[in-house]
Swiss-Prot record:
It comes from Idiomarina loihiensis (strain ATCC BAA-735 / DSM 15497 / L2-TR). F-type ATPases have 2 components, CF(1) - the catalytic core - and CF(0) - the membrane proton channel. CF(1) has five subunits: alpha(3), beta(3), gamma(1), delta(1), epsilon(1). CF(0) has three main subunits: a, b and c. It comes from the Bacteria. It is found in: Cell inner membrane. Keywords: ATP synthesis, Cell inner membrane, Cell membrane, CF(1), Hydrogen ion transport, Ion transport, Membrane, Transport. This is ATP synthase epsilon chain. It is a peripheral membrane protein. Belongs to the ATPase epsilon chain family. Its main location: membrane.
Length: 138
């Protein structure tokens, strides 16, 4: 019988946020949402700013915010190498909304392609954080 769990490691440059056994993992990939279950095919993909959601072996759901990175799926093992990773309950709604407002203002006032691209990236990160905070409040 095939195993019904996966080993998950979520690592950023600053910290190892999680290492343990989980039932499922959901990640925002570069092409959309990815649901990873035991037996998933090997995969290597870029991840966008967004949520990493996992269900622990005990059935508890956890949400993390990642600001991009790489996802590697191997038989029985998932690794998230994040540029920045923060536990969902450590995110600050007021700070995220202020970052969203700054990014929107920068987009409206951008004079160069570089400034515009940076503002779009900042807006994407802020919206992802706000989304995670709202999901945690449900």
């Amino acid at each position: 019988m095939a195993t019904q769990t996966l080993n998950l490691d979520v690592v950023s440059a600053e910290d190892k946020l999680f290492s343990g056994v989980v039932q499922t993992v959901q990640v925002t990939g570069s092409e959309g949402e990815l649901g990873i279950y035991p037996g998933h095919a090997p995969l290597l993909t870029k991840i966008k700013p967004g949520m990493v959601r996992y269900v622990s072996e005990a059935g508890d759901e956890e949400l993390l915010y990642v600001a991009g990175g790489v996802l590697e799926v191997q038989p029985g093992h998932v690794i998230v190498l994040a540029d920045v990773a923060v536990r969902g309950d450590e995110l600050d709604l007021q700070e995220a909304e202020a970052a969203k407002k700054r990014a929107e203002e920068a987009i409206a006032d951008s004079g160069s392609d570089v400034t515009y691209a940076e503002a779009i990236a900042e807006l994407s990160r802020a919206l992802a954080q706000i989304d995670i905070i709202r999901k945690l409040k449900r």
